[in-house]
Amino acid sequence: MHDMGHAPGMSMQDMANDMRNRFLVALLFAIPVFLYSPMGKMFGDFATPFGMDRNLFLFIVATGAIAYPGWPFFVAGWRAARNKVANMATLVVLSVGTGYVFSLGATFFYEGEVFYEAASVLLVFILLGHWLEMRARAGASDAIRALMDLAPPMATVIRDGREIEV
C-alpha cells in the first residue's frame, strides 16, 4: 500500500484512519462545491460568500476537496507514470484531474462550463470505497494475526518413533 503515497511503516489501521480522514475532508469541501455548482441550483440559488465570482469560489473550495484528499492517488499515479505502468491510481488521477483541469481552464482562461462538482464528488466516492477496503483489510490482518497468536510456539513431532520438539 506504500505505492498509494502512505508512509512506510504505517499499519493497516493507520492507513484506514488516514483514508477516513481524507474522505471526511473531501466530503466537507464537496458539499459546498455541489451546492454552488450549476447542478446544485436545484436545491436553491445560493449567493457566493463575499460576492465572489461563482467559478472562482468553486475553484477555491474544489481545490480543498481534491488536493489533500487526493494526494495519495496523485503520488501513486506519478509513480505509475514514471514506471510506465497503469493502475487504479492512474484512472483516479485521470478522471478527477481531467474534470478539475478542464474546470480550471474554464475558470481562468476560456469560457465554458465547469465540472468541479463532478471531480469533487467522484473523489468522495472513490475515497469512501478505498476507506471501506482499508478497513476490511485491517480487520482481516487483525484476524490473521489473532489466529497466528493461537499457534503454540513449540510443537512435538514424532520422527522415526521418537518425539522431537520443533
Name each region found by the language model.
Residues 13-154:
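Transmembrane helix-loop-helix hairpins at the membrane interface
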Residues 4-5, 55, 89, 162:
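Intrinsic disorder/low-complexity detector
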Residues 1, 50, 165-166:
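General structural signal for secondary-structure boundaries
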